[in-house]
């Protein structure tokens, strides 16, 4: 399958790239600049700014699936504005390219702890990442009105970061709008297993026009 990955050199994007490349898919790895790219034979590395819609659209043409792991940086003081601007531009570029399948890597903040309370509303939610989490939440609401694309929005486990990563188990449980928790009540998943989840979804397409999540 021909897969374009936006944000392919980032923490999540690079893990997804590795997993899909190892499954022998044909990958176009898109990032803002070349420098940390893959050298695998089935990977083509492309440098393009997501805010250049025409150029991005041209690079996406011919893909069977576009995966957006775009993130302007958690320490970026303008992450809220930059994420929403970039996400909307990516969405437009996918449509202009004539690609139907579009998988977005979002955040856990929009998951529901109960029928009314989202993760982002929890008193323990870190203030420093709230702007980015709020942007991802609002972008999910934008996608809910998108009826031209076969979009999917993946919310990682609450504990999905450098400290919980480093191991690929290939095992996970799926969910929809609520965090998947283990026997200890923790929502946790390594970035390597996030990549397994996304690669499996690329191949199976179970959550068209839905948000989904995963955990151990």
Residue ranges and their predicted role:
Residues 141-162:
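Conserved beta-loop-beta element that borders a ligand/cofactor-binding pocket
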Residues 75, 109-114, 159-163:
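Conserved catalytic-site region of short-chain dehydrogenase/reductase
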Residues 172-189:
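A conserved pocket-lining segment of Rossmann-fold NAD(P)-dependent short-chain dehydrogenase/reductase
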Residues 146-147, 161-170, 201-210:
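Glycine/proline-rich active-site loop of Rossmann-fold NAD(P)-dependent oxidoreductases
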Residues 135, 185-199, 210:
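Substrate-positioning beta->alpha
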Residues 26-28, 88-131, 145, 152:
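Conserved Rossmann-fold NAD(P)-dependent oxidoreductase catalytic core, especially the SDR/UDP-sugar
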Residues 3-23:
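N-terminal Rossmann NAD(P)H-binding glycine-rich loop of SDR-like oxidoreductase domains
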């Amino acid at each position: 399958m021909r897969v374009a990955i936006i944000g392919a050199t980032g923490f999540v994007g690079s893990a997804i790239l590795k997993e899909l490349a190892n499954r022998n898919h044909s990958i176009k790895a898109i990032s803002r600049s070349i420098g940390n790219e893959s050298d695998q034979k089935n990977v083509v590395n492309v440098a393009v700014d997501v805010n250049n819609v025409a150029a991005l659209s041209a690079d996406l043409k011919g893909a069977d699936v576009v995966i957006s792991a775009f993130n302007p940086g958690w320490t970026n003081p303008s992450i809220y504005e930059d994420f929403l601007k970039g996400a909307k531009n990516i969405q437009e570029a996918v449509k202009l390219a004539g690609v139907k399948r579009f998988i977005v890597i979002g955040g856990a903040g929009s998951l529901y702890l109960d029928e009314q309370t989202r993760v982002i509303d929890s008193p323990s939610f870190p203030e420093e990442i709230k702007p980015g989490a709020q942007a991802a939440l609002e972008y999910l609401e934008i996608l809910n009105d998108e009826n031209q694309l076969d979009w999917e929005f993946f919310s990682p486990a609450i504990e999905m970061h450098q400290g919980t990563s480093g191991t690929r188990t290939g095992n996970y449980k799926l969910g929809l709008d609520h965090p998947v928790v283990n026997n200890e009540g923790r929502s946790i998943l390594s970035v390597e297993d996030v990549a397994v989840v996304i690669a499996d979804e690329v191949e199976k397409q179970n959550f068209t026009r839905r948000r989904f999540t995963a955990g151990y």
